[in-house]
Amino acid sequence: MTASLAGLRVLILRSARPGDPLAARLTARGAEVHSFPLLAIESRPALDADLSAAVAKADGWIFVSRHAVRHGFEQLAAAGLVPSRVPIFAVGAATAAALREDWGIAARHPSEANTEGLLKLPELQAVQGQTLVIFRGVGGRDALRAGLRERGASVHYCEVYRRVPERRWEPALAAALAAPGPLLLVAHSGEVLRALSQLLERADGSMPRPVCLVPGERVADIARGLGFEPVIAASALAAKMEQAVCRWYTPERFRT
């Protein structure tokens, strides 16, 4: 694609990351990109004895995000648990990269960076009688555990972090939303969309609901339910998100 995004402002609703591939791709095409984290990440209490025992005897560990890698291994180290020969899985390439870069672990991961992709991995087909541990944040989808249980696995959640509202960015974000010109927000989860909706409601309801780039139909359904118009990417991979923006944005769309 050679499409230009000149004139478009993009607000990514998460913390700025060094070398963020999505921000870099959109900036290279001429977009003005800013990051506004609506949610902060907090570690949860240390693993209890029962969960530590389940992790220690597990036949596989599954990490569903970079945050799960960071906070999960902090808790594993505190509990004296280190990976030996246990197979380790990641939801996608970015999470696998975090495991490799932070811990030197080569994780198996699908090309389709989501629950459905994980469930297609050959290593997770015949799991009858196995114990698997999913490292994740509080809440979220239950589809992965349900799918593995249907195949006969015993599945435990290790919820190592939680998301909490990050209110200090709200004035700056509200000002950015009110500025004139083409605007697109990037929301990677339903949780972020709900936080955005609450922010707009606190702004007396007069602010229009912006268009939001989202990864997949599930998050798009949440966006519609909250009154946002979704631009739907095939997945959360930076290349797929970029493609969706380029399909959606043309300067002609915003000419009056």
Question: At which residue positions do the language-model features occur?
Answer:
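Signature of uroporphyrinogen-III synthase
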Residues: 1-256
